[in-house]
Amino acid sequence: MRTDLWVIHLDMDAFFASIEQRDNPRLRGKPVIVGGSPNSRGVVSTCSYEARRFGVRSAMPSREALRLCPQAVFIRPNHAKYAAVGRQVRAIMRRFTDVIEPLSIDEAFLDVSGQDAVRVARELKEAIRAELHLTGSAGVSYCKFLAKLASDMQKPDGLTVITWERAQELLPTLPVRKLWGVGPASEQALHALGIYTCGDLLAYDPDTLRKHFGKRADELILLARGIDPRPVVPYREAKSIGEENTFPVDQTDREYLSRLLERYADNLAEELRRQGLYARTVTVKIKWNVFVEGGPKGGDFLQITRSQTLPMPTNDARTIGRVAREIFARVEWEGRKVRLLGLSVHNLVKQGEQVQAYLPI
């Protein structure tokens, strides 16, 4: 890991809703919900902090949001406008560094090594406020994981710094769900082992942890110690994202394989969010222990893929995992064993460039 790395994670505050409040003074101070209509099967895209005080959250059904906050003002998303503002934010970022890794339309990592990172974060926030009349929360640290963790500690309009010394104070009691890449399925698997905090994780036998999580165990251990070797990588567009595993012993345990798909879904959802992408198609790949002769390679193991297209693009781990399990449950085994299992997502779209028809209004 680089010892001279300094990273800023900038996360714009309630981005879509804040833009609407900025552009319409009558909405300022009111609970604003950007998303689908509560009169149909709409969902909340985002909401203002005034609405969040009533328990409204992103991805919540709009009807539930209306029940929690009857006085809320619902606004149809204008993704073209949000994307334009996102480009303005990115242009301001580029004044400070060219090494920018977008996570979504409203958040990004910036590599500001060799500069006064705290000063840069402060000036970046001030420029966005002065020119765009919006606020963002910044986290500053020596690695990406902790910079992202820091940006969420003083929202909205915060600036938090996590040094190595501060990390050693925070991490022992940090819930494992806060670790990079730990989604609902991984959190549940860790809890089943009695691991609830980073301190618990570091106290657990690493060899036993590897039996449950494979090479991912070592990544979790490093994160729990405050070590994240990943560099800030400028965005490169992907056509699909996937993960698969060839087993040393052919598998017949459907429940185990179903849980493995959930773990894959956690990882894919995290990667989608990292790249600011949503997926509309989920594909399960299975290679059986049945060898079929022929073809250019002289033969190969029998393989099938099964896909399902979603009504709306998603980067939610639970949704991807649920669809993957449903696909898997429909596969007929016919007495065969599983040699390889994979999960991938396709038909990727960038946040802010989604077709508005995807959102039920």
Swiss-Prot record:
Cofactor note text: Binds 2 magnesium ions per subunit.
Keywords assigned: Cytoplasm, DNA damage, DNA repair, DNA replication, DNA-binding, DNA-directed DNA polymerase, Magnesium, Metal-binding, Mutator protein, Nucleotidyltransferase, Transferase
Molecular function in Gene Ontology: damaged DNA binding; DNA-directed DNA polymerase activity; magnesium ion binding
Localisation per UniProt entry: Cytoplasm
Single GO biological process annotation from the record: error-prone translesion synthesis
Entry binding sites for Mg(2+): 11, 106
EC number(s) on file: 2.7.7.7
PANTHER family attached to this UniProt entry: DNA POLYMERASE KAPPA, DNA REPAIR POLYMERASE UMUC / TRANSFERASE FAMILY MEMBER
The keyword Transferase appears for this protein: yes
Upper classification of the organism: Bacteria, Bacillati, Bacillota, Clostridia, Eubacteriales
Positions of disulphide bridges: none
Cofactor: Mg(2+)
Entry function: Poorly processive, error-prone DNA polymerase involved in untargeted mutagenesis. Copies undamaged DNA at stalled replication forks, which arise in vivo from mismatched or misaligned primer ends. These misaligned primers can be extended by PolIV. Exhibits no 3'-5' exonuclease (proofreading) activity. May be involved in translesional synthesis, in conjunction with the beta clamp from PolIII.
Subunit text: Monomer.
Enzyme class, UniProt record, top EC level: transferase
Catalyzed reactions per annotation: DNA(n) + a 2'-deoxyribonucleoside 5'-triphosphate = DNA(n+1) + diphosphate
Sequence similarity: Belongs to the DNA polymerase type-Y family.
Entry-linked Pfam families: IMS, IMS_C, IMS_HHH_1
Cellular component terms per the entry's GO annotation: cytosol
InterPro entries, per the entry: DNA/RNA_pol_sf (IPR043502), DNA_pol_Y-fam_lit_finger_sf (IPR036775), DNA_pol_Y-fam_little_finger (IPR017961), DNA_polymerase-Y (IPR050116), DNApol_IV (IPR022880), IMS_HHH_1 (IPR053848), Rev_trsase/Diguanyl_cyclase (IPR043128), UmuC (IPR001126)
UniProt-listed Gene3D superfamilies: 3.30.70.270, 3.40.1170.60, 5' to 3' exonuclease, C-terminal subdomain, DNA polymerase, Y-family, little finger domain
Domain UmuC: 7-183
Taxonomy, superkingdom: Bacteria
Annotated protein name in UniProt: DNA polymerase IV
